Structures are given as C-alpha cells and as structure tokens.
C-alpha cells in the first residue's frame, strides 16, 4: 500500500503517537508515551533528556529492533521515505523487508560499540558486509570502500585496522568503526545514539563535521541522541526534549537555548558544565545540583581541599606498554603498538589526577597497566611503598581490594547472567568483607548513592539504559572502599544531571575516605571541575602535567591548546570555528619491532608544571 500522500514532500520520517512498553512481573511498564515528531530531508533533530527518558528505545523502535527484546510498540504512523523516494510504513514491514531497510535506508550508530561489533570478525569484514549486502559490490570493492570510510573517520593506519578485531582497538577507535559502518551505505536517515560519547573532543569535532558533510551531500536526515548540550548547539537544527518517556518541549535550537519554556529544559541547560567556570580557583568544586522545581537555585559550591601531604599512594616511573602485531606467512611479530612510552607520575591520597588526550593516546592502557590487566614491558609501579608490577597473581588479588577500576564500556564489564545486585556483592564475597545481610544492605546503600533504587538489585544489565549501567559499575567499584579508583571515562555515558550527582558522590567519598582518583576522560569541562592535577597524553607519552589551574588557564603545549580549543560550546551563536580538517593525517604509534621512540623531555615552566618541547608545532595543531 503506497503512503506517499501521507508524508510531506520535504520530510523523510514522520512519527505519530508512538507508545513503547515492556512487560515486567506481569505488569506493563510504559517507556515512551504519545511521542510525535517529524524529520526533514537534510535536517538534524537532536533528542535530549536524562538517562532512561526513552531516547534510545525510541531509536530502537524506529529500527524495529524492540520486538526481539520483548518491547510492545504501538504507533499511529511511522513513515519513512527511502533512498528510492518510495514511502513505507515501518510497522507494516516484515522481518525480511526490514533487513533491506536497515543499513541502506536507515542506519544507526549504537551507544556501546564493543557490544555492537561482532568479536569474531575483523573490522574490515564487518564494514564490507554491509557494503556488499546493500550496494551489490564485490568483496574487493567492498574492502576498498571500507578502507576509504575508515580514512574518513580519521583512523590512522586504516589498512592495518581492517585486519584487526574489535577487542584490539580502543573505545574511541571502536566507536569510529561503528560510525564508518553506519555511513558506508549513505542512508536516507541516520540515527546516532550518543555517537561521540566515547570520543575525545578533537575526534568528536571531526566526526561532527563528517556527519555534516555527508548530510549535505546526501540530503540525509539525522536524529542525534545525546546528553551533551555543547554538541546539540553545534549540530542541531531542531531539538526535542524528553522527560520520563514524554516530549516536554520541542523547537529550533535557538528557541531551546535562548527561550526554554519547560522547567526541565531550563534545569538541563543550567546543569551543563562550562569550560572556564573554574577560572581563578585552585581546588575541585561540587557541581550545583539543580532541581526541576527550582531550576535557577544553586547551592553554594564547596572547595575540596582533600590532598594529604607526605608520601604518594601511587608512584609510576618510566612505564612502557607495547602490543605485538603479527604479519607474514610465518605470523611473526614484525611491528609493535607503542601504547605507553616511559610514562611517570605520582598520585597522593585524596588527590584527583586526570589523564586527558585523544583516543589511542594511551590513557586507558596506562590505567589498565597499573592493575596488571595488561602486562608492561618496562618501568616501576609502586603502591603504598610496595612494588606491584612484579607481584605474584595471588598477592595481586589482595591488592585489587585497594585499587578498583571503573571500565569505559559498562555493558561489557557486567555479567549478563547475573543480577546487578549479585555483580555488586561479588567483590564483597570474594574478599570476605561482610556477612550476607550486611552485604545486601551495603548493595542497597550503594545503589541509592548512585541514584538508583534498592529494588533494582534484582534486575539484569540489559534492563537498564547505558547511563544506568555506568552507575551500577561505579557502585561496584565503591563497594570495597578502595584507596585508589581508576575511572576510565566513568561519567562519559551519563547525562548532565546524573553526571553532576556522580561527580559530587566521588568528591564526597574523596573527602570522607581520602580516596585517590586517576580520572581518565576526554570531557575537558568535567576534568576542569574535578581535578587537582592534569596530565596530557599524546601518542603514549605525557607532554604536559601540572596543577589543573596552570594547565587550563596557561596551557603551554600546542597539543593542550588544541584539545581546549576543540571543546564544543553550549551556545548556538558561539559555534567554535572548524580548525581540524578531515583530510589531515593522524600520526601512528605503530613502529617496527625493536625500534625505539625518543622519549620527550619535560621542562619545568612553573610550580609543579612540566611541559615537553614539541619538535614541530604544526605536528600537534594539524590545522
């Protein structure tokens, strides 16, 4: 049945009265209620709202992926204009017909790339599969196009990456592979569910530009699901604000930012961390928690003077971590990824040291090496005066009670067969810290501290949104009262209101228990708020380290200045000028086996502030 007359000529998508529910304990739980919106050709519609507000399930309903998960979807109208200009009713399509629609006419970039990529196929095979299926290309043609797409999303050594598996890539790299896969068939509608959450600010700027370029070329409609209001200001034409499964406000990006009508929209905008808000301040400060009823009311910020003088709790010297790459008929190691090269730093009790840098710069590998989750080839790691890089596995388990890790991908770090209560209680049982009833009470307390309900303990990971899963991982890391927490992008998946609550919780625990944080992040506004000191990493080496105020207010290294310049501004009229060109090459940290890389020499430029001298300013700016 043709539907061309039902869809306005300029629209590529129209949704009327979308209702989504899930069955739980024989009860119907509404996730989305009476949602209606349209999308014009070449337009970007940003859907914003809290974690659990219904943003992602709306996208999954459009892709017809909810039926398999037991979702109940009802909709008066769900019309899509295909690339062929035919208009179809999505709810009327069979499973076989939808396979031809997904990827070709409507593509989706998922929030968690590790769980969206097939672990048993190489990156090249997965991108080429979509191209072969929808463009009738040969295997050779598809692989050539796959390499071109990896080049477009700024992945260095694209030819090498084609033959790698997802687990061999960083989180940001995996996200870029997902973006390349979604864009490879030039769909009529692109649904991007938090596509830049795992990306650093410079790559984020390039990906946003890439989506804009392809959108203009193909007159592609884009639905951009995000909690980053800076990204919304930069990319959106219209904004749809969701709260508890309903649309509470919609309008142009200028209307939403300059004249928000709904209290929740005003609260959402007021909670956005602004780069430069800590100017003139030496210590971390809590985020003001803004209520829905009183969006303009802010509690006075409290300075966090928590650093304990004396010996550092963690001392790292000349840490080296490399990964072998095999090639040739004999599958010999011919090259190595120099992930971490001679990295040194100290961490004091009660201090937050933030590691920042681009995806693939070695931030996460540094954190994993400290817990021996990856083996290092050189250097010393000393915790509480004891060298831990040479400990036996038995002694290492006891150490992990004092050093906990919050992983970047929450779904991959939670056991899908265990309830989240069992996942949180597991470390308490392993280390024999609390008896049964006390452990259960501890789980309930932890869930409440991270903004969840105690009864959530009986649910499974797939029943939560991405942001809620990240809060569960934070609760599990806090269960043992560790001395050091390594937080790898711990708040990147959270919306601004929950992010503020979690960071305030981390600061409170730091004040109460003297916990030291190694905070790995690409969100410069959050780093500015939470950090005592900041270390900037580039190609596996620290190129600038110092007090947070010195690094942010007086950045000395050109790469640090580049990172700060790339931060999106949550103001549509103050859009950042595009400084990073998609045609530029990213340097590679892959070298021949045995080849040594010159270690950077840090020079003191102020109290505790050390900077490497770049060989070429142009190499870091890449304008």
Swiss-Prot record:
Organism: Escherichia coli O157:H7
Membrane topology, from the record: Peripheral membrane protein
Gene3D superfamilies reported in the protein's UniProt record: P-loop containing nucleotide triphosphate hydrolases (3.40.50.300)
GO cellular component: plasma membrane
Keywords, ordered alphabetically: ATP-binding, Cell inner membrane, Cell membrane, Hydrolase, Membrane, Nucleotide-binding, Repeat, Translocase, Transport
SUPFAM superfamilies (alphabetical): P-loop containing nucleoside triphosphate hydrolases
Top EC class for this record: translocase
Domain ABC transporter per the UniProt entry, residue ranges: 15-269, 314-564
NCBIfam families: PRK10261.1 (NF007613), PRK10419.1 (NF007739), PRK11308.1 (NF008453)
Protein name: Glutathione import ATP-binding protein GsiA
EC number, UniProt record: 7.4.2.10
């Amino acid at each position: 049945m043709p539907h061309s007359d039902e869809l306005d000529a300029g629209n590529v998508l129209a949704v009327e009265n979308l209702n989504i529910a899930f069955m739980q304990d024989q009860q119907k739980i509404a996730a989305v209620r009476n949602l209606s919106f349209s999308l014009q050709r070449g337009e970007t519609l940003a859907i914003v709202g809290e974690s659990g507000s219904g943003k992602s399930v709306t996208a999954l309903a459009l892709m017809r992926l909810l039926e398999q998960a037991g979702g109940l979807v009802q909709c008066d109208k769900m019309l899509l204009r295909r690339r062929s200009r035919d208009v179809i009713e999505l709810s009327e399509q069979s499973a076989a017909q939808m396979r031809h629609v997904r990827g070709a006419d409507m593509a989706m970039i998922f929030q968690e790339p590790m769980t969206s990529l097939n672990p048993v196929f190489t990156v090249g095979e997965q991108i080429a599969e979509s191209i072969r299926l929808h463009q009738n290309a040969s295997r050779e043609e598809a692989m050539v196009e796959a390499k071109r797409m990896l080049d477009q999303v700024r992945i260095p050594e694209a030819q090498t990456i084609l033959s790698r598996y997802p687990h061999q890539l960083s989180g940001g790299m995996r996200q870029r592979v997902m973006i390349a896969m979604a864009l490879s068939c030039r769909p009529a509608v692109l649904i991007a569910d938090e596509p830049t959450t795992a990306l650093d600010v410079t790559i984020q700027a390039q990906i946003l530009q890439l989506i804009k370029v392809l959108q203009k070329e193909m007159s592609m409609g884009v639905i951009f699901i995000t909690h980053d209001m800076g990204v919304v200001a930069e990319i959106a034409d219209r904004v749809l604000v969701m709260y508890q499964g309903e649309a509470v406000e919609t309008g142009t990006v200028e209307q939403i930012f300059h004249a928000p009508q709904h209290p929740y929209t005003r609260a959402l905008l007021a909670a956005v961390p602004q780069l430069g808000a800590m100017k003139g301040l030496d210590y971390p400060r809590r985020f003001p928690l803004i209520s829905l009823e009183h969006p303009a009311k802010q509690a006075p910020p409290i300075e966090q003077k928590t650093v304990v003088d004396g010996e550092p709790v963690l001392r790292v010297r000349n840490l080296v971590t490399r990964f072998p790459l095999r090639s040739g008929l004999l599958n010999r190691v011919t090259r190595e990824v120099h992930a971490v090269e001679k990295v040194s730093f100290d961490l004091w009790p009660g201090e937050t040291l933030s590691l920042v840098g681009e995806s693939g710069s070695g931030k996460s590998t540094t954190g994993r090496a400290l817990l021996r989750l990856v083996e290092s080839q050189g250097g010393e790691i000393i915790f509480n005066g004891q060298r831990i890089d040479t400990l036996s596995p038995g002694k290492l388990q006891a150490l992990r009670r004092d050093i906990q890790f919050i992983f970047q991908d929450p779904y991959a770090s939670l056991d899908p067969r265990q309830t989240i209560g069992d996942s949180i209680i597991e470390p308490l049982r392993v280390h024999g810290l609390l008896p049964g009833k006390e452990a259960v009470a501890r789980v309930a307390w932890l869930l409440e501290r991270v903004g969840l309900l105690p009864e959530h303990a009986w649910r499974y990971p797939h029943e939560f949104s991405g942001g809620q899963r990240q809060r569960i991982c934070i609760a599990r890391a806090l269960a043992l009262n560790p001395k050091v927490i390594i937080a790898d992008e711990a708040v990147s998946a959270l919306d601004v209101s929950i992010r503020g609550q979690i960071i305030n919780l981390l600061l409170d625990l730091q004040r109460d228990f003297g916990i030291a944080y190694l905070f790995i992040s690409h969100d410069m506004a959050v780093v500015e708020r939470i950090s005592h000191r900041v270390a900037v990493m580039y190609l596996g080496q620290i190129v600038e380290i110092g007090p947070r105020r010195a690094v942010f207010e007086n950045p000395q290294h050109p790469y640090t200045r580049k990172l700060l310049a790339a931060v999106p501004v949550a103001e549509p009229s103050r859009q950042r000028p595009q400084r990073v060109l998609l045609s530029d090459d990213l340097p590679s940290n892959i070298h021949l086996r045995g080849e040594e890389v010159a270690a950077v020499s840090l020079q003191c430029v102020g109290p505790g502030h050390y900077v490497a001298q770049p060989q070429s300013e142009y190499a870091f700016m890449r304008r």
